[in-house]
Amino acid sequence: MDLGGGVGVVMAAVDGGGGGELGGGGLLGSRLMKHGRGNAGDQEHEWRPPAKQARGGDASSAAAAVAAAAAVSEAVKVAAPFLLGASCSPGHGGEQMLSFSSSASSCSSGGGGAAVAAAAAAGGAMPLYYGTPASCSGLSSVSLSSSMQGAMARVRGPFTPSQWIELEHQALIYKYLAANSPVPHSLLIPIRRSLTSPYSPAYFGSSTLGWGSFQLGYSGSADPEPGRCRRTDGKKWRCSRDAVADQKYCERHMNRGRHRSRKHVEGQPGHAAKAMPAAVAAAAASATQPSAPAAHSGGAVAGLAINHQHQQMKNYAANTANPCSLQYSRDLANKHNESEQVQDSDSLSMLTSISTRNTGSLFPFSKQHNPFEVSNSRPDFGLVSPDSLMSSPHSSLENVNLLTSQSLNEQQSSVSLQHFVDWPRTPAQGALAWPDAEDMQAQRSQLSISAPMASSDLSSASTSPIHEKLMLSPLKLSREYSPIGLGFAANRDEVNQGEANWMPMFRDSLMGGPLGEVLTKNNNMEARNCLSESLNLLNDGWDSSSGFDSSPVGVLQKTTFGSVSSSTGSSPRLENHSVYDGNSNLRDDLGSVVVNHPSIRLV
């Protein structure tokens, strides 16, 4: 049976009652408005109350209405799965459906319960219904084509318009499921949209009550792709990489917002300091193994060196952090220097105490006993630093007094001043055979005043068989007259101590060389005055002519200064142009060499 035909039958039956009155004194019916016509002046299509009361004797019209209601109920049962109001049984007379359009005009139903059943059975053509009590009557009805806003405005209940629409939609789907019928695809599309987008306008009637984005429990911050990186990099599309666990971004975009000027972990000093003790401990462990193979011996030595260096670094850091330890170190250094000065003064006093001895006993050096074998271990031989010129002025004066005093008077033999002499070419030529002779030979340097001189150009006087003694020169005297060379090194075990306390007697007589001021053997006071005056020659710019014109003793007229920087290696020698005061013999001995030196200075 066609649904439209059934509705038409119901309308015809209701309208064919001859304007039947409603039995039992109750008003039920309402005339249906005729839609699709725009005649506003047509008054017969409007709602109006029934004009006549039902007459009790008109039984034939009531029987016809009951028959029509039975036919409509059969039609409704057939179309029940497709009607929203089919869940309402005909016996529940309190539900009146806003229904369908029809060409029939208004009607008045009669016969009480039959008309109510027919009207209830005819419901379901409209997806919106209202539950009203049975005593109510005279409700106006609108068709499907009427405005939805008007219908929603008349809703009075606990639901909002959007919730009511959603409820009707779910109830319709339930009817299809209850009738074992396939649910149309058009009913499922809005539900799918609601799962993906909470702002789907297809099933929002009115959002005036503010339900908005909270529909169905979805909020605007919900991520449609939870496992994907949310970084867009200022573009339209999101990053295609998967996000890190419990993070919003991938590994590439995790550190994108950090500052660029942060240093790397490898460059920080804290990590290097932490790694240093571990490396030192590993090296020390490898070095302290008792049975280390020979292949790993180099690693053990390196480990010991690293451990020693680390210990020095720790000590330096502790000393730097503790100012008291720094002060203590300075005190120790000062005490050490003072002890060296005391030892030097002691050695000088010993030299002064034996100054009455014969010079021959003081210098028992022969051709075989070369003093350079004893004291040539210092690599700075023949060189004088500026601080050595200024150091120990009193000791230099005492040394001069020693050599210019009675020792010079007692020495009768005179030795002419000749070229410089060289030390033995090989260690075997010396009488003192030291265990480390080769090492000493490697540390020697040639005799030089201001320019290097070849050893072949030196004098052959040391190798000459005529001379029994070594020729004395200022460079030799400045080197060999140490406490060891003066006979105090009887025990060879004391050589190292003597070298540590070495204070050369004439270390200040190197730069000037022999200047040619010769003294007589019996004029000791004049020699001292000559020394005090010749000390000022250093301030005269090493001018040889101006220094010797003003000789305090008046024994020298003019002394020529030898070629010191000659490349031929010839030693500066004295021109025998000096005139002596009461002596005819020229003495080029020890005294004439020692006292004439402009580099000694009194403070």
Swiss-Prot record:
It comes from the Eukaryota. One of its GO terms (biological process) is developmental process. The keyword Nucleus applies. InterPro entries: Gln-Leu-Gln_QLQ, GRF, WRC_dom. Residues 223-267 form the WRC domain. A motif (Bipartite nuclear localization signal) lies at residues 228-238, 256-263. Disulfide bonds: none annotated. Pfam families: QLQ, WRC. Residues 561-571 have a biased composition (Low complexity). SMART domains: QLQ. Keywords: Activator, Nucleus, Transcription, Transcription regulation. GO terms for cellular component: nucleus. It is found in: Nucleus. Signal peptide: none annotated. Residues 34-58, 561-582 are annotated as: Disordered. Residues 158-193 form the QLQ domain. GO terms for molecular function: ATP binding. Transcription activator that plays a regulatory role in gibberellin-induced stem elongation. The QLQ domain and WRC domain may be involved in protein-protein interaction and DNA-binding, respectively. Belongs to the GRF family. This is Growth-regulating factor 6. It comes from Oryza sativa subsp. japonica. The gene is GRF6.
